[in-house]
Amino acid sequence: GCGTGCNTVIGSRENRMYRYEPRQNDAVNSDWMCDAGRLDYKWIGRDDRLAKVRGPKGGTNWPSALKEISDHLAKADEGSVAIVASARQTNEELFLLSKLAKRFKALTDAVPRSGEADHLLVAEDRNPNTTGAQLTGITTKRVNSKLGAIAKGIASGKIKTLIVYGEDVTQHGIDAKLLGKLKILIVSDILPNATTRKADYLLPGCSH
């Protein structure tokens, strides 16, 4: 995806996705979409897609995991929580994370993605919702400006709880060794990565 925001139609059958197609919007993408966007769906049905909730002791269920997370956060001190969200999340998800961040005075940020623009359909910003992340206060005009501070906070022991949505933070300055210093790592994602493997609580995410 990218920041253009092409209007699309999803072709699916029996809970399996088969295609993206452009939906006409003359103000954004007319009748077109790029080939990369059209074909960017196969990961949704990957065999290794995350499907089961995991807690510190292994497999668990949603009610138990959410209660344990809630109980932990209820005891968290202000400034001891940080959130790394994704600029690929919806406005609604980002808004709720921003409310959680305000409750704990948490440091928050997102991960930037960029590529070459074609000045027609493909934007340089390869995140579809950087604007939403900025408007909700999750990140600033310079996306990733606070990731370094989050890493330093974990290293110093000030940040004890990290919440990660849809990103592999080990690729962005918060490595596995730092993650090991946390009291609790809460991760929601769709596909496995180095961050999901380190999670104390793993909550499978939704693609659409």
Which stretches of residues belong to each language-model region?
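Catalytic alpha/large subunits of respiratory electron-transfer oxidoreductases
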Residues: G1-H208
